[in-house]
Amino acid sequence: MNVVITLPRNLITAIVSGAKTIEFRKSYPKDFDCRQDCVFVIEKGTRNVVAYFCVSDFQYESNPVEIWRDYSIQIGVPFFWFMAYAHRCRAYYLWRIRKAAYLYTPLDRGLSLGLTTNPQSYVYTQYTCAHASSDLR
């Protein structure tokens, strides 16, 4: 099942350009099929779904210092930002990004996905990658 997350513009740009290949989160969607599902991204501060990416796998990690040592380049955020987020968690999941693209026409989260607010972590959606592929930039 596809999911929706919210990210700031600079991280969306890094994901689509290939500079950021790992998204780290406190959890992962258990009903997500890496072979066919995708993650839609809402730009933080807006109602617009502007991009999507596919995930190759989810990896569990428990030590933020080791995560930073091993994956700092792929994570694509400064150390202080990472540690401000990471110190609050006991478990971390690395979402390995396989491919990403901007949507040609941004989608309104309410009209297209039926969401009234931007998700804090992630939410499931019935909207599919096939729908989005017609809107690729």
Give the positions of each predicted feature:
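Structured alpha/beta reader/binder surfaces that contact nucleic acids or chromatin modification marks
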Residues: 1-137
